[in-house]
């Protein structure tokens, strides 16, 4: 008879893999108490092995949860319930005793900088959802490390889930398995509890064999207890709890307490033709080309870009004052639509094997397809849309969901940086902010100081995105591209960033802002983007090494006329790309001031107020 987990009364669960005795005591207690609450039939302690992964994938294939894509090596397609396709900001909450620990109290209306829930309300919500929620299912115990095992910058989590899709995705996105338990020992870990919220027998049939409970979806973070609790959604951002939940919301709070930074940033290395290398971190809201920039093929001869990470950076000053960064993830969870050989050839090479696709279209010959893939379909090949039906362009809706994803191992990226898993991290010398701004904002400018740079991050705005549930083309505020991911009060977050300047011996990176998306009057992009963005990286690189020419403007330093290498580019209206309109910037600074005063209110650091006033003053003198 297999070993059992029992409450000594009327409940017991079979241990179908691994042994409770192999778990550190605190992990074992977490597993036992959660099992007694959620009542799974079986408990499976994940070891992260290839054999376990194969078994889970075949099990899901038999259940009709995923489908094998025969055109590629070990690639799979999951189609979700159409009600479970994205992060849901309205159902994502942070629980602290005081509301102001989570969000600044706005002058009026709701905070746009996070969602607070009281401990009492959470208690009620939890008790409605979790008791018995895993009946008839298997509880998987996933030990995972955010960051390379053994790095002083890494953190460990234990996720309990009833979704094998989560297990196989977490194996790609994190370092996962027995080695993590060995590294953990009796150390601290973040407790992550996830359920799709569909105990068996089902009350109503599943859509696409995808288990979820949209009516009761809730993603909750309890930073004081180091716990993340997610219910009702199987979608990546809500169920792979190492990703945004741990690596940003929980980690930003840990970072504040421990004196480091957890940021929504890619990390890339740039090497010039002389062999000099510099690392940059960059924060863009989703749909602004973060993954494309992280994996860029530069068009400039002799320049090389290598990828450390495409989404999240954990950064800490070392003893020598260098800002060291690791990518806490182990894979890429990228938006598929728009990814093509033209826009991101390295991503296309990365996803040819060992990849789980979600909500993309399928070709009748066992391949994948999406809007912007730029590949003609072979004769007689049909398309099955993400809704599982044969697709016709005349349908008037996309074949792939706009937020469809690939989940793929970072190690497969052809330009992965040789130091991407270096335990001490890579030294960051430039930080780039950016957004999708069709008018008014120049291609690139450099902040006048660290304090001004922090203000530039706070003032980030961008056209809205598919990764969240908003629709339509509105310019949204998204400070530091962290709008949906702050783990604590944004006013305190700004103070934390500003405090970096007070660190003894800190070598502060230069801060830049880019906008690849400025348009001309006819609505055409002024800048070709993609690999040509290497020309802008070259200028930033030169600024970091003290070489690139720049002129001061009211909003920051912009490249001198000859400082940007435009050879071979053809017709680019540089004058329009860098035009700074007094009228536009007067409106922009008013909008930023209004937003910060209303949203951050009394928690706005005085230094940021000073930066607003100084910018106003400089613009008025144009």
Swiss-Prot record:
Residues 457-487 are annotated as: Omega-loop. One of its GO terms (cellular component) is cytosol. The modification Phosphoserine is found at residues 19, 90, 118, 286. The modification N6-acetyllysine is found at residues 70-71, 91, 473, 521, 594. GTP binds at residues 287-292, 405, 436, 530-533. The modification Phosphothreonine is found at residue 178. The active site is at residue 288. Binds 1 Mn(2+) ion per subunit. Induction: Regulated by insulin, cAMP and dexamethasone. Its EC number is 4.1.1.32, 2.7.11.-. Substrate binds at residues 87, 235-237, 286, 403-405. One of its GO terms (biological process) is glycerol biosynthetic process from pyruvate. GO terms for molecular function: GTP binding; manganese ion binding; phosphoenolpyruvate carboxykinase (GTP) activity; protein serine kinase activity (using GTP as donor). Pfam families: PEPCK_GTP, PEPCK_N. It comes from the Eukaryota. Keywords: Acetylation, Cytoplasm, Decarboxylase, Endoplasmic reticulum, Gluconeogenesis, GTP-binding, Kinase, Lyase, Manganese, Metal-binding, Nucleotide-binding, Phosphoprotein, Transferase, Ubl conjugation. Mn(2+) binds at residues 244, 264, 311. It catalyses: oxaloacetate + GTP = phosphoenolpyruvate + GDP + CO2; L-seryl-[protein] + GTP = O-phospho-L-seryl-[protein] + GDP + H(+). Gene3D superfamilies: 3.90.228.20, Phosphoenolpyruvate Carboxykinase, domain 1, Phosphoenolpyruvate Carboxykinase, domain 2. InterPro entries: PEP_carboxykin_GTP_CS (IPR018091), PEP_carboxykinase_C (IPR013035), PEP_carboxykinase_GTP (IPR008209), PEP_carboxykinase_GTP_C (IPR035077), PEP_carboxykinase_GTP_N (IPR035078), PEP_carboxykinase_N (IPR008210). Acetylated. Lysine acetylation by p300/EP300 is increased on high glucose conditions. Lysine acetylation promotes ubiquitination by UBR5. Acetylation is enhanced in the presence of BAG6. Deacetylated by SIRT2. Deacetylation of Lys-91 is carried out by SIRT1 and depends on PCK1 phosphorylation levels. Phosphorylated in a GSK3B-mediated pathway; phosphorylation affects the efficiency of SIRT1-mediated deacetylation, and regulates PCK1 ubiquitination and degradation. Phosphorylation at Ser-90 by AKT1 reduces the binding affinity to oxaloacetate and promotes the protein kinase activity: phosphorylated PCK1 translocates to the endoplasmic reticulum, where it phosphorylates INSIG1 and INSIG2. Pathway: Carbohydrate biosynthesis; gluconeogenesis. Monomer. Cytosolic phosphoenolpyruvate carboxykinase that catalyzes the reversible decarboxylation and phosphorylation of oxaloacetate (OAA) and acts as the rate-limiting enzyme in gluconeogenesis. Regulates cataplerosis and anaplerosis, the processes that control the levels of metabolic intermediates in the citric acid cycle. At low glucose levels, it catalyzes the cataplerotic conversion of oxaloacetate to phosphoenolpyruvate (PEP), the rate-limiting step in the metabolic pathway that produces glucose from lactate and other precursors derived from the citric acid cycle. This is Phosphoenolpyruvate carboxykinase, cytosolic [GTP]. The lineage of its organism: Eukaryota, Metazoa, Chordata, Craniata, Vertebrata. The gene is PCK1.
């Amino acid at each position: 008879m297999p070993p059992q987990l029992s409450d000594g009364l009327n409940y017991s669960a079979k241990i179908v893999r691994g042994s409770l005795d192999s778990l550190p005591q605190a992990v074992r207690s977490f597993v036992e108490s959660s099992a007694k609450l959620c009542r799974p039939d079986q408990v499976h302690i994940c070891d992260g092995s290839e054999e376990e992964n194969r078994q889970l994938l075949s099990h899901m294939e038999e259940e009709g949860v995923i489908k094998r894509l025969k055109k590629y090596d070990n690639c799979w397609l999951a189609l979700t319930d159409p009600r479970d396709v994205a992060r849901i900001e309205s159902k994502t909450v942070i629980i602290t005793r005081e509301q102001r620990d989570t969000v600044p109290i706005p002058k009026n209306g709701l905070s746009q900088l996070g969602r607070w829930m009281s401990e009492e309300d959470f208690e009620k919500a939890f008790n409605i959802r979790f008791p018995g929620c895993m009946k008839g299912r298997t509880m998987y115990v996933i030990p995972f490390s955010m960051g390379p095992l053994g790095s002083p910058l890494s953190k460990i989590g234990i996720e309990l889930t009833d979704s094998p899709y989560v297990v196989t995705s977490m194996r790609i996105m994190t370092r996962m398995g027995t080695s993590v338990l060995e590294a953990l020992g009796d150390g601290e870990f973040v407790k992550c509890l996830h359920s799709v919220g569909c105990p068996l027998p089902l009350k109503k049939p599943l859509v696409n064999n995808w288990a979820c409970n949209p009516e009761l979806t809730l993603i909750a973070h309890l930073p004081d207890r180091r716990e993340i609790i997610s219910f009702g959604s199987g979608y990546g951002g809500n169920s792979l709890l190492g990703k945004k939940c741990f690596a940003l919301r929980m980690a930003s709070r840990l970072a504040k307490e421990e004196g480091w930074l957890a940021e929504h940033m890619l990390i890339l290395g740039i090497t010039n033709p002389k062999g000099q290398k510099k690392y940059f971190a960059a924060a863009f809201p989703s749909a602004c080309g973060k993954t494309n920039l992280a994996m860029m093929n530069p068009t400039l001869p002799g320049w090389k870009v290598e990828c450390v990470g495409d989404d999240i950076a954990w950064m800490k000053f070392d003893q020598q004052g260098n800002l060291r960064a690791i990518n806490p993830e182990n894979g890429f969870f990228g938006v598929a639509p728009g990814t093509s050989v033209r826009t991101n050839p390295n991503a296309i090479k990365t996803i040819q094997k060992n990849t789980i696709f979600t909500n993309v279209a399928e070709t009748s010959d066992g391949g994948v397809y999406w809007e912007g893939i730029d590949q003609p379909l072979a004769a007689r090949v049909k398309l099955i849309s993400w809704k599982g039906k044969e697709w016709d362009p005349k349908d008037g809706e996309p074949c792939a969901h706009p937020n469809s994803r690939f989940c793929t191992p970072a190690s497969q990226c052809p330009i992965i940086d040789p130091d991407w898993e270096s335990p001490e991290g890579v030294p960051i010398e430039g930080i780039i902010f950016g957004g999708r701004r069709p008018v008014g904002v120049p291609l690139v400018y450099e902040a006048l100081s660290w304090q001004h740079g922090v203000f530039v991050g706070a003032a980030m705005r961008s056209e809205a995105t598919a990764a969240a549930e908003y629709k339509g083309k509105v310019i949204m505020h998204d400070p530091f591209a962290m709008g949906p991911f702050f783990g604590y009060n944004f006013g305190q977050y700004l103070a934390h960033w500003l405090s970096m300047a007070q660190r003894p011996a800190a070598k502060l990176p230069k801060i830049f802002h880019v906008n690849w998306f400025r348009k001309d009057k006819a609505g055409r992009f002024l800048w070709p983007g993609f690999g040509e963005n290497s020309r802008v990286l070259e200028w930033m690189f030169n600024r970091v090494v003290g070489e690139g020419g720049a002129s001061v403007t009211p909003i920051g330093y912009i490249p001198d006329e000859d400082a940007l290498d435009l050879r071979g580019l053809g017709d680019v209206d540089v004058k329009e790309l860098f035009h700074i309109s007094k009228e536009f910037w007067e409106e922009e600074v008013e909008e930023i001031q209004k937003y910060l005063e209303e949203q951050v209110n009394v928690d706005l650091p005085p230094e940021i107020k000073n930066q607003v006033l100084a910018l106003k003053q400089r613009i008025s003198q144009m």
